[in-house]
From Swiss-Prot:
Superkingdom of the source species: Archaea
SUPFAM superfamilies reported for this sequence: Pseudouridine synthase
Classification via InterPro entries: PsdUridine_synth_cat_dom_sf (IPR020103), PsdUridine_synth_TruD (IPR001656), PsdUridine_synth_TruD_CS (IPR020119), PsdUridine_synth_TruD_insert (IPR011760), TruD_catalytic (IPR042214)
Organism: Natronomonas pharaonis (strain ATCC 35678 / DSM 2160 / CIP 103997 / JCM 8858 / NBRC 14720 / NCIMB 2260 / Gabara)
Recorded family membership: Belongs to the pseudouridine synthase TruD family.
Protein name: Probable tRNA pseudouridine synthase D
Keywords of the record: Isomerase, tRNA processing
Isomerase is among the record's keywords: yes
Gene Ontology MF annotations: RNA binding; tRNA pseudouridine(13) synthase activity
Length: 435
């Protein structure tokens, strides 16, 4: 186990689990170097394209996107069709600098969809409900590592990951740095402001806090707005690409006197982005819990007394709604379930209904929460900001293959797990090389 990159440590990712020196190199030298294809799980809800739009109002389509941010693509579709952005939904958010194939739906009577640069769009049917976030079994990845310094180290790293995963390649199920903002990893800090009830700090941080990884001009604009708080001018000064920051600034220009004004400004964002802030805070706490579990030497592929495990669903993936706290008397039985892939050790994505478990795992969670000054009751928040919490497996295993010339990693992951968390163990590089 070795210390991670300093940028990763700011989002709770404190260690690598492999000791082999990194291959070096970089991902995403070109979009085709990072390919993602969803393993779809929506077929049973889909009807033919000629189904009655009155009964099946949601048009379901598959899109292969090249260098499209998911939110930007949804906005482009809604604008082209002349419908509300909230009518467009999707199964999973993907990386922009990639070639991705994923499922969307739009509430729209006409089966015709727009032609957009960098997008191949295939209508596949109609449904009585929208495609919702999480309506997928997982994702298949093919990642090319360009210009590695030590490509021969990849096989040794893969072998170490198999040891960590208990026979199959495994990594801690960290949330990757892109969860928090690839260039400006602050969404968890905005979320912590929200949990603290400081709506002003949250809105101001999102608009004004700069990062040295951003263009110099963008840094200057953010810092200038922070200094003068001239929200009326801010909407014009911010680059057009920062449309969410502009939306917040424009709302604050109408009034920035009370906490409710700042909360209303954050509510100008699409609902999924409103949820993103508290979700990122939960993810940060989760990463911290995993790092402390690693530091203490607790296993990831099998439980200890006090762990909360969840059981597998019909697809063999973790089902966070079916859980059990591991007692001394049940330890060996649950270990066998984990060994056979029927149960998974979990940690909490903390919310109002979080169950801590017992023993050392619960102690870790409480220590991390105390350190970030968060409690489950803090998640009792209005609208999209509140969360009851859930659980997430601490380990993710995969059918990893490694090929040389060019160095290529191929694997699949369950929904919600990050390809860069696998890739980082190989490159051991600045997270910017992964993004």
């Amino acid at each position: 186990m070795r210390d991670s990159h300093p940028v990763e440590q700011t989002v709770g990712i404190e260690y690598y689990v492999t000791e082999t020196d990194g291959t070096g190199g970089r991902l995403r030298d070109r979009p085709a170097d990072f390919r993602v294809r969803e393993r779809e799980a929506f077929g049973a809800d889909c009807r033919p394209l000629d189904a009655d739009p009155g009964s099946y109002p949601h048009l379901v389509f598959r899109a292969t996107l090249r260098e499209w941010d998911t939110n930007d693509f949804a906005s482009a579709v809604s604008n082209a069709l002349g419908v509300s952005r909230e009518r467009v939904s999707w199964a999973g958010t993907k990386d922009k600098h990639a070639v991705t194939t994923q499922l969307f739906s739009v509430r729209h009577d006409d089966a015709a969809l727009p032609d957009l640069d960098g997008a191949d769009i295939e209508p596949i049917g109609r449904a009585g409900r929208p495609v919702l976030f999480g309506d997928l079994a997982g994702n298949e990845f093919e990642l090319v590592i360009r210009d590695p310094d030590r490509p021969e180290h990849a096989e040794a790293t893969a072998a170490e990951l198999c040891d960590f995963g208990g026979g199959e390649a495994g990594v801690p199920n960290y949330f990757g740095t892109q969860r928090f903002g690839s260039r400006r990893p602050i969404t968890h800090r905005v979320g912590l402001d929200v949990l603290d009830g400081d709506w002003e700090a949250a809105a101001v941080r999102y608009v004004c806090e700069s990062s040295e990884r951003e263009p110099e001009r963008t840094q200057e604009v953010r810092e200038g707005i922070d200094a003068d708080r001239d929200w009326a001018a801010a909407g014009e000064r911010l680059p057009g690409s920062l449309r969410f920051e502009r939306a917040i600034a424009n709302r604050l220009a109408e009034g920035a006197e009370s906490p409710d004004d700042y909360r209303a400004a954050l509510e100008e964002l699409p609902s999924n982005l409103q949820r993103m802030f508290v979700n990122a805070a939960q993810s940060y706490v989760f990463n911290r819990i995993l790092s402390e579990r690693l530091r203490r030497g607790l296993p990831f592929d099998e439980p200890v007394v006090g762990d909360v495990v969840c059981f597998s669903d019909s697809d063999g993936n973790p089902d966070p709604d079916r859980t059990q706290t591991v007692t001394e008397s049940r330890l060996e039985t649950v270990r066998r379930h984990c060994e056979r892939g029927r149960a998974f050790v979990t940690a909490p994505l903390v919310g109002t209904e979080t169950v801590f478990g017992d023993g050392e795992p619960a102690e870790i969670t409480r220590e991390v929460l105390a350190d970030v000054d968060v409690s489950p009751t803090d998640f009792e928040l209005p609208g999209e900001f509140g969360s009851s919490g859930t659980r997430r497996a601490v380990l993710v295993t995969t059918d990893l293959t490694v090929e040389q010339e060019p160095l290529t990693l191929s694997f699949s992951l369950p929904k919600g797990s990050y390809a860069t968390v696998v890739a980082r163990e190989f490159l051991k590089a600045d997270p910017e090389a992964l993004s």
